[in-house]
Amino acid sequence: MGPIAPEQPPSMPATASAACRAEGWTAAAEANSRSLIDPAWAPFGRPEAGWEIYVALIQHEIGTGCPANSEGFAAALGAWQGVNGQGGDGVVSEPVFLALKSVVQTRREFVRATASGACPETPDLITAARLKEGYGEKQVWMRPRALDAYRRMVAAARAAVPEAAADPEMLTIFSGYRSPAADAARCQADGNCDGIVRARCSAHRTGLAADMVVGHAPGYTVDSSADANRLFMTHTATYRWLLANAGRFGFVNYPFEPWHWEWTGEAP
């Protein structure tokens, strides 16, 4: 797979501001600039080219707003590496990203609950969302407290993000609770029961997961996992607000899917 050619703004300015310069990190910044869109790897099991899709996630985790090709980004990554036992050279490599991915993934209650191979039972109680909360007025369901948290988060996002306030479809849910029987039928129909797209034990069976609209690239659907579409999503103000603020409402993201968020206020 070659470099992505998105129809969105570039992910970083050509030059970093003075605040993103850091003495001693030039070589690391240059290495990050070279690897951003070129190397082939598969951090989530599917071949990808480079790590540009995950820039916003990495920036959030290492606590910097500096662009990925800057010395400031490299310095912040180096500090994160030091704290997390990953050396400290400031270079995004596959081992470093996988370590960061592990930190993010283990915040998901569902990941911890399924680590032993067990799959959570379906909830005893789910509640219907309002039709306007479903994408295209689709009827969706979640656990009651998860739905309440979703509503509080969406209200805060729309108050803070003009993009989300202006588009009534932004942050609507296109998939909430899904029964195991429905998931099994879908994965059999798609011929992909064990891959990324369909999983035998899906977080959606818990009633805690919500796939939310965070934008989509021209020509793609809101749930397309095409690299160009995922890259577009990570540039939206709505997605970046969620990265910074969803945790306040108990939601965590599955990094491969910018649209997939899980509420952690109850056990799966």
Predicted feature locations:
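Extended, low-complexity, intrinsically disordered C-terminal regulatory tails
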Residues: 158-191
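A mature extracytoplasmic/lumenal domain signature
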Residues: 92, 96, 104, 175-177, ...
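Amphipathic alpha-helical interface surfaces
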Residues: 149, 182-186, 208, 238
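Short, solvent-exposed loop/turn and secondary-structure capping segments
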Residues: 89, 111-112, 185-189, 223-225
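Long, contiguous hydrophobic alpha-helical segments, chiefly transmembrane helices and signal peptides
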Residues: 77-80, 171-177, 186, 210, ...
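Catalytic cores and adjacent binding grooves of peptidoglycan-active enzymes
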Residues: 193-268
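Glycine-rich, flexible loop segments associated with nucleotide phosphate handling
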Residues: 65-73, 167-172, 228-239
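Cell-envelope/ECM-targeting effectors and their regulatory/trafficking segments
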Residues: 1-165, 180, 247
